[in-house]
Structure formats: structure tokens, C-alpha cells
């Protein structure tokens, strides 16, 4: 198998991003590679489980980012600083923003303790969007945290209220790897779920958080903006930029990708003039205008690249290979570490990137094909 083909298989095997969506729209060729994927994931799983048994698994990394605020790095498959949550504390309330996947529940609870709090005192779980890497643990957490109420956009609520279809679809794709990757995916009881929309104000943990609707990456995406501190919790609307790597990558999974809506969401966030963005993948961004300019350019240029390949009659697998070869050199120059490619693949992988763009062009702009 070529290096490029191997990367594609790895990316398919580690489709963390938006699995609740992809499980319902997964193309046939993804499933046809199941044997190769299973072999790769089996090796990865065994290495990961050996680390757990030996006690060498990286621990959660809890960092205080300001008064009453902590950043939590989950050790997802042994890799830190790829998936993050945020903890807010104040006025006898504890709020978690994007609690992460179900496989990281114990990591999250231990991180809250490490920050000096009792997880049983968590009162609010705020969801930027309901993709499993951000919100997969919500249903499990409300069963363990008696005071916690979940807040999500109305378009994301059905995915949390009933996860039966999501679990069944994802299980067909991941099989025995399902629990390792995502843990338990439990439904959230209706009485423990509150609906939020753009324009709402949440007075939580001593903060006044504005809710802004920011579709583009997902139709159920919102951000939370603290006007007084200037902190904006951005989910995935600000893209992916891992720590110590000056490289922005667009996470464009199906089925909700909408480039026009995303551009409008970027303009909205910039108009708020936040002092810092806290993103899910991963951490703080302070050069906000430059960051969004790069993201907007990448969203457009990668989309045009995929469109050009579709016009040339290329199939999905070939377009994935082409996009990898087209974009990999820039990431390597920015990271100076080949391992950065795999880390970015965990956060958002090439197959889903291409699938998202292909669906977007076919659904939104068939006249350009």
C-alpha cells in the first residue's frame, strides 16, 4: 500500500469528526475498506490499551486560562491537545463548554477535580454543536451529575434526545472499535435539555454569555461570547489549529457544510471583536483577524480544488489522494514534524473534508459541476 493510501485508510479509521452525521451518509467505498481499517485500528487499539495497562497513558492536562476559567485537554487515544473542553466557575456554579466524547468522561471528571472542584457540583453543560467529539458525553454526564443541565441549539437537540440511530449507524462502521473511540453515547432526558438560540443571554457561573448562531460547519453550531472578559468559546467555527503549529485547517464534514453561511459566521464573530478565541481543536487564538483570514482562504481554495477534481471526473478516493498531496507540504513546513499530519488527522481528516465538499457542491451548487 502506498504512503498516500495508508494515510487515507488511517484517516477513515479515525473519523472522529462529525461521526453522527457521517454514519448516516457514509459512502460505500468507506465500508469496502473495512478490512484494511480494522487491521490498522486493531494495531492502534492494542498499543493504546497496553499504555493504559502500564499506566503510561498521558493524563488530562488542566490549564488555568483566566479568572474562573480552565482549559481541559483530553488524552484522546493517547494524544493530548487535540480535543478540548472548557470549565467555568463562579457564584457557586460550574459550567462545562463542550464536554467531549463519551470515551473521555472519566478524563473530564478527573480534570474537574484537578481544577479543585467536585464534579457533582456541575450545573451547566454548554454545547457549541452536537458532533460526538464535542458533545458525545452529554447523555452520560447528566446521569452522573445530578445538578447539570445541557444547553444546545434547537437544531441539535434531536441528536441528543434520541441517539439510537446515531449509535446504530456508527456501530455498523466502527464495530468493536466503537466503544474505544466514543465510549457510551446515551440519550439526554428531555427534562435535562434546554434549547438555546442566537440572541439568547446566559447568566452562568458569574458570567454574561451571549449566544450567537454560527452555522457553516454545522447547522446547529453556536458560540458563547463573554462580553466583559472578551473570551469567545468558538467550537469549530474557527477551524482547527493545533498548539505550536502555525497552520489553520478547515473542518468540513458532511452533511451540513455551507461555505456561504460559514463566511457569514466568520464575519459575525469578527464583528464581536473578541480578545481571544478558545477553540475545540485546540486552545487559545489571539491573532484573530489573521486567523480568520487564513481560514476563510482555505475554506475557499480547498473547496475550489475539490470542485476542479469533480469537474475532471475524479472519484472520491482519488480526490482525497490529490488533496493530501496538494496540502501536505504546507503543513509540514509549518509544523516541521511529520507527526503533526497524524495529529491533524485526528482532529479533522481528509476523507471527511472531501466528502463534505463534494456533498456541498452537489447540493448547493450543482450548476458549477
Tell where the protein language model's regions lie, with residue ranges.
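Low-acidity, Ser/Thr- and Arg-rich intrinsically disordered low-complexity segments
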Residues: 2-6, 10-21, 26, 39-45
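Conserved beta-strand hairpin/beta-sheet module of binuclear metal-dependent hydrolase folds
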Residues: 59-115, 224-234
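Metallo-beta-lactamase
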Residues: 64, 101-103, 159-213, 219-289
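Residue-level marker for buried hydrophobic side chains located in beta-strands
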Residues: 95, 126, 150, 231-233, ...
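Active-site metal-binding motif and surrounding structural segment of the metallo-beta-lactamase
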Residues: 106-152
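Histidine/acidic-residue-rich catalytic or RNA/ligand-binding cores of hydrolases
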Residues: 288-297
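C-terminal regulatory/interaction regions
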Residues: 305-369
